Regions:
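FIC/Doc superfamily catalytic core
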Residues: 1-316
Length: 316
């Protein structure tokens, strides 16, 4: 991939086909494979797979994996909300979840509403996860519906609070509709926007894609292409969790990879900017950053599992 075309070839910018080549190989998969072959990316993926393999056999997940997944959804919502500026304690969210008081998009507390939306989206992901012990394997909706459903959960509270229009919830941008949030670089419009969205949908559904690279690029495209007017970064982080579970990299569904962006926001922005540069160097740097976020999420999952096993996870 020529240096300045790395991102374009992955995501189908104007002039770059996302269809099948004469040999039957998808250009998207070819570009992803080239990113995955980078030495730093290979090392990062190996580290992620090793850490996730160790997590898979945590003793707490033998019988209490459902509780662990539910707690991960709470911790993920708290962490992701913090990235978006909504600061709510895990204890407060747990209390509302236990009381069943989060059925409405607006409670009068904008911070709680935002985090509750993220929790609803995370809980939806849990419902799509295969059983960790057993044979249950729920049907996951196609990519376009998947994006719309997650965005409705995330952006519903924004609409209820008057921050976005109802017509923007779950509906991707088209034409020259502008975004309401910042991100790395200028958000695409018109033909480029349509091409980036189609490339994103293809990437989510592509078979045999390198898993870590796929999850990282999907996240980065949500940040840089910004297919919705608002809530793109939060949906991107949710998609990382979904894809790593679906593709078998992190089958437990307990890694809280949302923690890392909140702990080191400067590194998050810098890595996203590197991706948006469009160079192979920048794309690889972003994938390595995503691997670091997953590793931090696995560490949190190990702590979560210890707390679940000890019966103390509701205390923090």
């Amino acid at each position: 991939v020529p240096k300045r075309r790395a991102q374009a070839e992955v995501m189908g910018r104007p002039g770059v086909s996302t269809g099948r080549s004469n040999a039957g190989e998808s250009p998207v998969l070819k570009a992803l494979s080239q990113v995955a072959a980078d030495e730093r990316v290979r090392a990062a993926e190996a580290a992620v797979r090793e850490a996730c393999g160790e997590l898979r056999w945590n003793e707490a997940l033998r019988r209490r994996w459902r509780e662990a997944r539910a707690e991960a959804a709470i911790r993920g919502a708290i962490a992701s909300g913090g990235v978006e500026g909504a600061v709510v304690s895990a204890e407060v969210l747990r209390e509302h979840v236990a009381a069943g008081s989060l059925t409405e998009a607006a409670t009068g507390d904008p911070g709680l509403d935002a985090v509750a939306g993220l929790w609803r989206a995370g809980s939806r992901l849990v419902g799509w996860m295969p059983d960790l012990v057993g044979r249950g394997r729920p049907v996951v909706p196609p990519a376009r519906s998947l994006l719309a459903m997650l965005h409705r959960d995330v952006a519903g509270p924004l609409a209820a609070g008057g921050r976005v229009g109802l017509e923007e919830v779950g509906v991707p941008r088209t034409g020259r509709i502008r975004v309401r949030e910042g991100g790395p670089g200028a958000a695409p419009q018109e033909e480029e926007l349509a091409a980036r969205l189609e490339g994103l949908l293809e990437l989510i559904e592509a078979e045999r894609a390198p898993a870590l690279v796929r999850a990282a690029i999907v996240h980065a495209e949500m940040l840089s292409a910004r297919p919705f007017t608002a809530g793109n970064a939060a949906v991107g982080r949710l998609l990382v969790r979904h894809l790593l579970v679906r593709d078998g990299v992190e089958p437990t569904g307990t890694a809280v990879s949302d923690l890392y962006p909140g702990r080191v926001p400067g590194a998050y922005a810098e890595a996203a900017g590197a991706y948006a540069s469009g160079t192979m160097e920048g794309v690889a740097a972003w994938v390595v950053w995503q691997a670091e976020a997953v590793l931090a999420g696995v560490q949190e999952a190990q702590r979560l599992c210890r707390a679940v096993q000890a019966g103390t996870w509701r205390a923090g």
